[in-house]
């Protein structure tokens, strides 16, 4: 079952996001293995990222093996761990 993740970074900026995404996503501009969707943009209090992975296990593997170990060392990246909301995806549609 697909698995959704919403990350909110209070005080986060576009520049911090771009530095962070360059470090944790493939250099060819694609998505990490198992990720189906990624969107990001400014929110009322900072920066918000929405992702959908093909499964909870896919998300946890990316989080534990790539995202969390890499984030603290990214120069100019998002400086704090996100506020996280996760959910099993009940309905996923694309245009």
Q: Where are each of the predicted segments found?
A:
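Short S/T/G/P-rich N-terminal loop/turn motif that feeds into the first structured element of a domain
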Residues: 1-50, 54-69, 75-95
């Amino acid at each position: 079952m697909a698995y959704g993740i919403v990350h909110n970074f209070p005080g986060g900026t576009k520049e911090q996001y771009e530095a962070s995404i360059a470090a944790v996503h493939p250099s060819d501009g694609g998505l990490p293995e198992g990720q189906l969707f990624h969107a990001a943009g400014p929110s009322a209090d900072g920066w918000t990222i929405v992702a959908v992975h093909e499964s909870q296990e896919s998300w946890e593997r990316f989080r534990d093996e790539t995202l969390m170990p890499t984030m603290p060392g990214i120069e100019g990246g998002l400086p704090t761990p996100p506020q996280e909301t996760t959910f099993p995806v009940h309905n996923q549609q694309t245009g």
